[in-house]
Amino acid sequence: MIELLGKSLEELQSIFKTHNIQKFRAKQLIDYIYHRYVFDFQEMTQFPKELRQWLSDNCIISLPTLITESISPDGKTRKILLEMTDQSRVEAVLMEQHYGYSVCVSSQVGCAMGCVFCASTQGGLYRDLTVAEILGQVVIFGALTKEQIHSVVVMGAGEPLQNYDNVLQALQLLHDPVICNISYRKMTISTCGWVPNIYKLADEGLPITLALSLHATNNEVRRSIMPVGARYELTEVLDAVKYYYDTTQRRITFEYILIDSVNASMEEAHALGKICKDFPNCHVNLIPVNGNEHIELYKPSITNMNTFKDIVASYGVSVTVRKEMGDAIQAACGQLKAAHGRKKENYE
């Protein structure tokens, strides 16, 4: 069977040409899938009956299956559990912002990074998601809302830069004016600091925002909560991020989870300010740690968080304490997880 989801206009035209189908039908098919959210070939009534039958007999649109949906009490956040064709499961989140709808997608089934504060990594990494599976998360939310998706953040389960090729291709398709027409400037990739592919992404020349999961200001603390720190020293990570900024001129976002008695002291606030002041126009997201069933980590007091924020800001750095969306439905930062049959690997 020929998979049609995750194919560019040119790829679909090539498939149709091989089977003696008129070229213009490819654009009609894209319109059905990505704009009308019609996935049943028999309901694509612009196509002649013979073409609908050929598509039914030879092609598939393998969207993930929606298993469950949770909606936050204020109605602004929706989390969905999706099942892939191999029964692997991932979660994705839709957030209604003042500027439109933003989707947080997963890039892998599980995660190998082992960050102690994150539920996504508890079962280890099972596999990478395909281009169609990443794209499908956005398409499903479009179908649920019947609204244009405004922005995409690759901040769900997985380390996006470990699944580099599939993530990049999915974002390129989302950017394609014929498909979803989402600006690269409305896309963010979050990384734990997978150094080689930070450089690689910088050299793509795309104005995608990079968010670094920093979470500590020295190697010792970072290694204790993020095992990837044992592979890449903090200076290596920051050098790569500086290269990304210098190459793309895109504002860097630093994610810093606040964990009481771990990384939330005033000394660490000063250290964070000193690091970030060297990145022009950067922004720091302070994220109070979110609980989940796997961990017993606690957020600092509101007073502590505000003082921490003020110290970072005193270095001339833009900083906010993130407004959590979806924590009531386990859809906030660090709470997404995946269900799958077996553990593949953990990063050590």
Feature map (PLM): residue ranges:
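Auxiliary Fe-S-binding modules of radical SAM enzymes
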Residues: M1-S88, K242-R250, L258-E348
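A generic beta-sheet turn/junction motif
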Residues: T85, E96-H98, G193, G205
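A short loop-to-beta-strand scaffold at the N-terminal edge of the catalytic core in hydrolase folds
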Residues: R89-L94
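Canonical Radical SAM [4Fe-4S] cluster-binding loop centered on the CxxxCxxC motif
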Residues: E96-E133
